[in-house]
Each structure stands twice: as C-alpha cells, then as structure tokens.
Curated annotation (Swiss-Prot):
Binding site for FAD: 10-38
GO cellular component: cytosol; glycerol-3-phosphate dehydrogenase (FAD) complex; plasma membrane
NCBIfam families listed in its UniProt record: glycerol3P_GlpA, PRK11101.1
Protein name: Anaerobic glycerol-3-phosphate dehydrogenase subunit A
Pathway: Polyol metabolism; glycerol degradation via glycerol kinase pathway; glycerone phosphate from sn-glycerol 3-phosphate (anaerobic route): step 1/1
Primary localization: membrane
Superkingdom of this protein's organism: Bacteria
Species whose genome carries this gene: Escherichia coli (strain K12)
Gene3D superfamilies given in the database record: BFD-like [2Fe-2S]-binding domain (1.10.10.1100), FAD/NAD(P)-binding domain (3.50.50.60)
GO MF terms held by the record: flavin adenine dinucleotide binding; FMN binding; glycerol-3-phosphate dehydrogenase (quinone) activity
Keyword annotations: Cell inner membrane, Cell membrane, FAD, Flavoprotein, Membrane, Oxidoreductase
Role description: Conversion of glycerol 3-phosphate to dihydroxyacetone. Uses fumarate or nitrate as electron acceptor.
Protein's cellular compartments: Cell inner membrane
Length: 542
C-alpha cells in the first residue's frame, strides 16, 4: 500500500453530506484553506436518503418549537440562495375523519408562535387546489412547505467551495485521527480508488459525518451516543400530487406525501436500530405495508399507482434513553466543541438537525472553527446565491432557446444559470442518454468536468441518470460508455460499474418487486444479461 505525502490546510471536514458541503463552502468563503474528505460520494448518507422536503417547520411546531423556528428561517433563505434546487410547492396539513379535528387549532396556534404562515382552508378548496388529496378530509391547513433536491443542493455547495479554493476528496475514508497530546491536528485517510494512504494536517478538524460521527469520535477515545432511527420511504413512478400533503397530527409513520422532480415520495417510518446496523439500508416488507396503507389515506390514487422503488436512511439524532421510537428526540442542532466538553482541542462535532437546516449548522460549525483560528470574517452564506441560482430560470431559458424545449428545460432545471456556459447546439447536446429525465451526453460531459464524478453512481446523483421510470434499463449502458469516452473509466471499469449500478437499482426495487415493477426488472435482466452479455457472476442478484 502506497503512502502519499501529507497535505496541510486550515480545516479538515469529515463528511460529504449537505452539512459537510455547507461547512466547506462557508469556510472557503471566509478565506480558509479547506480539505473535505468523504469515504464514498457526496450525499450518500442521510442527505440523499430523505423526503427532500423543504420544511416550513409546521411539522415540528407543536412538538419542537425551536426546530420549527429554525426551519421556517432556513426555508426562506433557501428559496433565495438555492432557487434551482428548490420548488415552492406549498403544503397541506389535512385532517381525516379518524383524526382529532380539534388538533387543527392547536397546530395553527403553534405555527403562528413559530412565525410560520398557517391558513385554515375549506376542505372543498383543498380538493380544488390538490386533486390527489383524500376527498374525505374534514379539515385542511395551507403552509409554505416545498421540495428540495438534496443531491443538487449538496453538489452546488461543493462546487462553490471548490471555486473558492477548497479541496474535495471523495472516495477517501478516514482511518484515524492524528493527535499531539491533547490536540487533534489531522486525519489519516485511505483512497478507495488507488489504495493509497495519506496524512492530512490542520489545526481544526470538523466531524460532520452524521450518524457515523460516533465512530469518528471513537478514534479520539470520545463518546457521542447517537440514536440510530431508520426511516423508510417509497417512490411512485410519476408525480401524483403537486402540493406536499401531511397529516394534521403529531408526527407518525407514513404521514407525508412529497412531490419531487418527476415522482412523488411517501414516508417515513421510524424504527430504532442497533448502531452496528447503520449501513444496512434494506426496507422490510412490514415497512412497505405500512407506507402503502397509510399513504393511501393521504392520496387514494396511490392504490392504483406503480411503486418505483423503496429506500431508507438513518437519522443522525443524539440519543435519549426513554424514547424507543426516536419520534420525540429533538431534530435540533448539536454542536460539540471537544476542547470544552472533553479537553481535546482542535476537534469539533456538528450533528443532529436535518437537511433543511444544513446551512445554519454549517454557519455554527464555521463560527466555531473561526474562533479557534482567530478569523473574524462574517458568515455570508445566507445572502450569497449558490452556483446555478444567480438568476431566475426564466432568464436563463431565454439564453438557450436554440435547443428543443424538453432538453433545455431539464438542463436549466437541474443546473440553473450555469447551463448556458456548457449547453450548445452541438451533437452531444442533442444526444439523449436518459429519456426518462431528459439527460443529454453534453450534460454528462459537464458533470464529469465540473461536479467531481468518479463513477456511474456518482453520475446518477449529479444528473438523475437512471432515476426515472426505467431505473437504468435504457440509459445505464449509454452512460457507462460515455464515462469511458470522457476518460473517467476504462472499458473494464465501465462494465464493472454498469453491473454495480444495476445491482444498486435492484436493491431498491426488490422490496416492491411485484406486478409491473417485477416485470420491468425481469426485462432489464434480459436486456443486460442476455442481449448485452453481462455474465451472471458479474451481476450478482440480477
């Protein structure tokens, strides 16, 4: 195993989720030398395994007022700085005949106290503005919920950090902390792509590894007791609702239906798991049954809608001994300066919170870093737009009128005002790779050159290749070939990554493999194993 020379910086950030990316951006904007390390790819943990809900905070207004206030504040900020990552759909909190209608008044009052707009509307009006909603509802409250693409949001933060000098090291796993007495002064990492090991040095190390933060802290003989609460979700094969639909009750299983991009999602469950199971993301048959049964109460059309796939994530909550479900644990932010808490200088942990509050978490963590380094520059991330969100989509679209509307519309939707810099009338930009999501070869090239793509799975998270109805059946082989063409992979690596990609898609289909989903999977297997010649031993489960 080779060892590379060490690198030095002002701060090392462990974790490539939204929070880690936000910290990298904030630190870089304040003039710090930044290195971020992530063992897999960006947004592969809890960041990429949630609803993608742009919380208004209403969901937490009754049970967690502090989190509710944080959510509505960040909701308004993200609508300004990340406009190409969010969709302000608005949301409905509905009361069904089996629910307590008197809770609605409590809910509205709690929202108002948290600064959240909450308007009670007539059930008939709710049915008009959201045809998918259960027509049996007896009450409805309109709130400023929305949706956010977590992959796009994380990638935009990473891109801005890189453009301000940050070094982003994906596929680099932390194998230990470097200490000098009672001070952490760096990390040891292993590059999964090359097998090389390396020492990285900095006066401050930030642990932003989410639920895996407990494991990172153990390298310093510290204990952060996390509460692993698994949440599972289902993806519909098309977008069945235009508003976020919530149950107007205290948070419970399967009580949010979220429209996102071309699909809708129903979730979540909440199940306490052992810490040694946090990398096991399998969705059980029981969870699927709960999600379907409860989801149909929100939108009866779900009963006739094909389920595309299932997935789950683990919430990075700080543990409480008296709550077996995790529902009553605060979603609030936890910032630990280990110099004050444990007498270990140079080490900070940021955890808790949620995707919605990633920017605020990053601000808190960066403030702590700057205090240690004597940096007095203020945070500007609440005011500076992310790359892609400098101008409205309508303005950008007028700059790329020469291409067919579906192609330019999808490109601008995903990349915002960065699109005109790479979109052209050339053959690459008219060559479709993924019909479901209207991804062109030109967009693949842009992602490879600018968005830190090392594999086919990385490309999926940057462009939505393989995330549509066919689940990679028609586009995965094209995308794999393009990665070789653009010098990301060799031919052998492309074949290996194609197998890995299809198996990852199958993991999400397997829990709901009946009817159309099973037939589609069998056809995919026939296409790649029979027609394209991928051998059984290469394809594992498929």
């Amino acid at each position: 195993m080779k060892t590379r020379d060490s690198q030095s910086s002002d701060v090392i950030i462990i974790g490539g989720g939204a929070t880690g990316a936000g910290i990298a951006r904030d630190c870089a904007l304040r003039g710090l030398r930044v290195i971020l390390v992530e063992r897999h790819d960006i947004a592969t943990g809890a960041t990429g395994r949630n609803h993608g809900l742009l919380h208004s905070g209403a969901r937490y207004a009754v049970t967690d007022a502090e989190s509710a206030r944080e959510c509505i504040s960040e909701n308004q900020i993200l609508k300004r700085i990340a406009r190409h990552c969010v969709e302000p759909t608005n949301g409905l909190f509905i009361t069904l005949p089996e629910d307590d209608l008197s809770f609605q008044a409590t809910f509205i009052r709690a929202c108002e106290e948290a600064g959240i707009s909450a308007e009670a509307i007539d059930p008939q009006q709710a049915r008009i503005i959201e045809p998918a909603v259960n027509p049996a509802l007896i009450g409805a409250v309109k709130v400023p919920d929305g949706t956010v693409d977590p992959f796009r949001l994380t990638a935009a933060n990473m891109l801005d950090a890189k453009e301000h000098g940050a070094v982003i090291l994906t596929a680099h796993e932390v194998t230990g902390l470097i200490r000098e007495g009672a001070t952490v002064c760096g990390v040891r990492v292993r590059n999964h792509l090359t097998g090389e090991t390396q020492a990285l040095h900095a006066p401050v190390v930030v642990n932003a590894a989410g639920i895996w933060g407990q494991h990172i802290a153990e390298y310093a003989d510290l204990r952060i007791r996390m509460f692993p609460a698994k949440g599972s979700l289902l993806i519909m094969d098309h977008r069945i609702n235009q508003h976020v639909i919530n149950r107007c009750r205290k948070p419970s299983d399967a009580d949010i239906l979220v429209p996102g991009d071309t699909i809708s999602l129903i979730g979540t469950t909440s199940l306490r798991i052992d810490y040694n199971e946090i990398d096991d993301n399998r969705v059980t048959a029981e969870e699927v049954d709960i999600l379907l049964r409860e989801g149909e109460k929100l939108a009866p059309v779900m009963a006739k809608t094909r389920i595309l796939r299932a997935y789950s994530g683990v919430r990075p909550l700080v543990a409480s001994d008296d709550d077996p479900s995790g529902r009553n644990v605060s979603r609030g932010i936890v910032l630990l300066d280990h110099a004050e808490r444990d007498g270990l200088d140079g080490f900070i942990t940021i955890t808790g919170g949620k995707l919605m509050t990633y920017r605020l978490m990053a601000e808190w963590a960066t403030d702590a870093v700057c205090r240690k380094l004597g940096n007095t520059r203020p945070c500007t991330t609440a005011d500076l737009a992310l790359p892609g969100s400098q101008e409205p989509a309508e303005v950008t679209l007028r700059k790329v009128i020469s291409l067919p509307a579906p192609l330019r519309g999808s490109a601008v939707y995903r990349h915002g005002d960065r699109t005109p810099a790479w979109l052209s009338e050339g053959r690459l930009h008219r060559s479709l790779v993924c019909e479901c999501e209207a991804v062109t070869a030109g967009e693949v090239q842009y992602a490879v050159e600018n968005l830190n793509v090392n594999s086919l799975l990385d490309l999926r998270r940057r462009t939505r290749v393989g995330m549509g109805t066919c689940q990679g059946e028609l586009c995965a082989c094209r995308a794999a070939g393009l990665l070789q063409r653009f010098n990301v992979t060799t031919s052998a690596q492309s074949i290996e990554q194609l197998s890995t990609f299809l198996n990852e898609r199958w993991k999400g289909v397997q829990p709901i493999a009946w009817g159309d989903a099973l037939r589609e999977s069998e056809f995919t297997r026939w296409v790649y194993q029979g027609l394209c010649g991928l051998e059984k031993e290469q394809k594992d489960a498929l």
